[in-house]
Amino acid sequence: MNLPIKNLVPDEQLIKEVQYNCDISDARDHGIYSMCSLVLKLRNLYKWEKGLQPWSEPEAAELLDWIEARESYWEEIAQQEFRPLTLNGRTCPVDDVNAVNGNNGARPYIYGAGHGRSMKAIFFLAEVVDHLSMEDCPVLLLGREHAREMASPLAMVQEGQVLVRTEPLRYFLYDHIQELRSSCRSSYRYFLSSYGLLAGGELDQQKLSAVLDQIAVNERHLFIYHEIGELLEDSLDSETQRRLIGRFPGSVIEFVSRAVRDVLAD
């Protein structure tokens, strides 16, 4: 990655424990995705695991072998419980983010835990590269990720802070720019042209790899302000929505409630 990321590595045992819980989450709930979405998420998980850039495409046979092995692994662990986390010789529950991160946020990494679509468990462990304040809300910019699961939301609110995950954001932007190139919408073409990505009407792939990090820096405020909106929105608070989704996961009720809250936040 070309962004200025410090080498701030968490304890190896903690990394393994968080990643194991990520794997269990994927094993339990990968069925919430369509086949197409699942393959795309697995492809990016493979790239992350192998340290590949978003534009580096694996050999199809190698990727399929990896997916087959991953599905077999999921069958082995799907019924396992999440593993407590070990920190300084003591254990703590997987949802105790304050115990892992420290109440003063002094550690150079952050542990994220929560729930996403259809109450899929979200875990990750990432290095903190910068602290910002926007609209009086604390914002943490995250860099290298040492553990992650398949969903990998680009940004989230945790303990009153907005967390922005640079690695998933880079994969997301790259994939969506590939989709934009076939669109004839003038707004999409304007976006691509503003970064000099159109050459003779076609997407300049080489230029994209060179400017992807800058695009991530320039566009991340869109995700930050959305999360700030969710943090400040109180007509449909996060706890009410969490209970609603927990009662009706994967339903029209969940999707409508998420859409309403997104609109209110924006």
Regions found by a protein language model. Give the residues of each.
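Short alpha-helix carrying the canonical HExxH Zn2+-binding catalytic motif
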Residues: 216-229
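Short linear interaction motifs
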Residues: 126-152, 203-206
